[in-house]
Regions:
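Short, intrinsically disordered terminal segments enriched in charged and Pro/Gly residues
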Residues: 36-47, 484-488, 530-555
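Terminal low-complexity/disordered tails
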Residues: 45-57, 61-66, 457-482, 555
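Extended, Lys/Arg-enriched charged tracts that mediate electrostatic binding to polyanionic substrates
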Residues: 187-246, 254
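Switch II of P-loop NTPase G domains
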Residues: 232, 247-249, 257-284, 297
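Short metal-coordination and nucleic-acid-contact micro-motifs, chiefly zinc-binding Cys/His arrays
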Residues: 2, 22, 59-61, 120, ...
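Conserved G1/Walker A P-loop phosphate-binding module
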Residues: 59-62, 71-72, 79-91, 126, ...
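Long, basic/Gly/Ser/Thr-rich N-terminal segments
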Residues: 8-32, 36-134
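Conserved GTP-binding G-domain of TRAFAC-class P-loop NTPases and closely related GTPase folds
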Residues: 287-479
Length: 555
């Protein structure tokens, strides 16, 4: 027998020797790895002369650092010294307070440094960067935001979080708050600039996300050379007392939400290096939001509002960037080329205000919500979201079919969501009379009082639903007709709408939904393999339940 530890979650397996050298998948975190050695259990350090807090006691607890993504036993966690004589850290540099493994604790349960000062702040034993206490206490859900340079990721992230912070307590009995203001200082500054500005009628602009810099990365010394790590945005998702599952499932609902926003250049081919691990978080993500900019695609520009000052910007090969992202996910996660990514991919079609009229897709601002008057509860309207995703997907198949194919070949669960961070066009700073589409690069901004975000919160809310944190319903419209001519092939249904000859292919995310046929403007129910018709409601369930988690028991 050999003892094997998953390199991601640390769970231990006892296997026969014949498994040595084979590639397997962890039943807990779905990480694929090759069994080629007999890993040693990580050494632990016993804390002596201590009166520890409750989580110092008991069995080991494994933690994933949100900075370097290495796992470690909580017994090995470092603390950040506070005495000024202890300035200088071998990993963070001369200006950082020294990190240390404590041997003494105060009566308050705080570590005591060499000079006798209480030290409440913890740090990763590998990268020495600060770890919030909530990362120790609560599980973490990681989401990555990817997009081309200048696609508006920073604006989208800021407005998305602003809307989500309002939407969750209002409709879903959740709060989303900062766990430590130092981690989210950039986002908080952006929110203040856009939504709490003392001069809301004056044009403002957010700075571009840089490849490096104190606001976006942390530089550490790793293996003798400097390495840049992205700064995570960390929030605590907690249910309110009015949440229907507060008493029965509070522990399952509470968690950290960790977001990463990289400069678009980080995802361009050739920008990956051992000195910059900015995109390694993709291997640990529970979902990806890919921001697709129609104004950086020459083919889609023909459908965009030509009066927008961003019209005819220099095109970017966003397909190549997507393939580079997918390649890194596979490489970092150990996913084979023939396998699909098992976490959801939400493609956010940004700046949709320039496409809304030409594409004829204009859902209500709150159309993604469904209210149950009897239960007095809100849920995501999965029927509406799926139908909008389908209509947008149909348009993209006419304009950029290769991108749709790439997205659905990469991930098992893909949605296409129209979003607009501003709800309208930005303004030209300092040159109001400059012609749109000019050759000179223009500085653009936005008037805070005119910001009307559209569906920016939906990608985030959809991720929460897909991971079992929000409820959803999928009741189709009355009079939806069945589809008679169809067949199932692997994870795809091939069909044609009644009275049409056009062939359609849809992945299983759309099965059971009532979708609008663009030719006759009628709704039709997409069949399911069991033939049960559309799902009447969808309780919030984890994606883990859709995955074969009994791998080890079957062998």
């Amino acid at each position: 027998m050999i003892s094997v530890f998953c390199p991601h979650c640390g769970i231990k397996y006892e296997l026969d020797d014949e498994w040595n050298g084979k590639r397997v998948e962890c039943s807990e975190c779905n990480t694929r790895f090759t069994i080629d050695v007999k890993p040693k259990k990580p050494e632990t350090v016993t804390v002596a002369e201590a009166t520890p807090r409750s989580y110092h006691q008991g069995s080991s607890k494994w933690i994933t650092c949100p900075h370097c993504w290495k796992r470690f036993d909580f017994k090995d966690i470092n603390y950040i010294s506070r005495h000024l004589d202890l300035l200088g850290d071998p990993i963070l540099g001369d200006d950082a307070q020294r990190r240390f493994l404590p041997v003494k604790f105060s009566g308050h349960g705080m570590a005591i440094d060499e000079r006798g000062m209480e030290c409440p702040d913890m740090a990763c034993p590998h990268c020495h960067l600060k770890i919030p206490e909530s990362v120790v206490d609560l599980p973490c859900s990681i989401f990555s935001i990817v997009g081309a340079p200048s696609c508006g990721k920073s604006y989208l992230l800021t407005t998305m979080l602003w809307q989500v912070r309002k939407c969750l307590p209002k409709y879903f009995e959740f709060n989303l708050g900062d766990v430590d203001a130092s981690f989210n200082s950039v986002i908080n500054e952006y929110e203040s600039l856009l939504f709490m500005n003392n001069n809301p009628d004056r044009i403002v602009a957010l700075p571009k996300t840089e490849l490096q810099g104190s606001g976006y990365t942390n530089q550490i010394m790793m293996n003798g050379f400097p390495v840049d790590l992205p700064k995570p945005f960390i929030f605590a998702l907690t249910p309110k007392t009015a949440h229907p599952r507060y008493e029965s499932g509070r522990k399952e609902l509470e968690r950290n939400i960790i977001l990463y926003d990289n400069a678009g250049e980080h995802f361009q081919p050739g920008h990956e290096s051992v000195n910059n691990l900015a995109t390694n978080h993709l291997a640990f993500s529970d979902g990806i939001i890919f921001v697709y900019d129609p104004l950086r695609d020459n083919r889609m520009q023909d459908f965009c509002d030509k009066t927008d000052p961003q019209y005819r910007q220099e095109a970017v090969n966003q397909l190549a960037l997507f393939h580079e992202m997918a390649s890194r996910v596979r490489k970092f996660s150990g996913i084979q080329a023939s396998d699909k990514y098992r976490q959801p991919l939400i493609v956010a079609i940004a700046k949709f205000d320039v496409l809304r009229e030409s594409m004829g897709i204009d859902p209500a601002a709150d159309g993604y919500l469904k209210y149950d008057e009897e239960k007095l509860e809100y849920a995501l309207d999965l029927q509406c979201i799926s139908n909008i995703s389908f209509l947008l997907r149909e348009k993209l198949l006419d304009i950029a079919p290769e991108f749709v194919g790439a997205a659905e070949s990469f991930s098992e669960t893909v949605y296409f969501i129209p979003v607009s961070a501003f709800g309208g066009s930005p303004k030209i700073i300092g040159s109001p009379d400059a012609p749109a589409g000019g050759s000179r690069k223009q500085a653009l901004g936005v008037v805070p009082s005119q910001i009307k975000p559209f569906w920016v919160e939906v990608p985030f809310l959809l991720h929460l639903y897909l991971h079992g944190l929000l409820p959803a319903v999928a009741s189709g419209p009355a009079g939806a007709q069945p589809i008679e001519h169809y067949k199932f092939t692997q994870d795809t249904i091939v069909f044609s709408f009644p009275g049409t000859k056009a062939r359609h292919e849809l992945p299983k995310a759309y099965w059971g939904m009532s979708l609008l046929c663009l030719e006759d403007k009628r709704y039709y129910v997409i069949p399911t393999p069991g033939g049960d018709g559309p799902a009447k409601s969808c309780q919030a369930t984890s994606l883990d339940e859709q995955i074969d988690s009994d791998f080890w028991n079957k062998q």
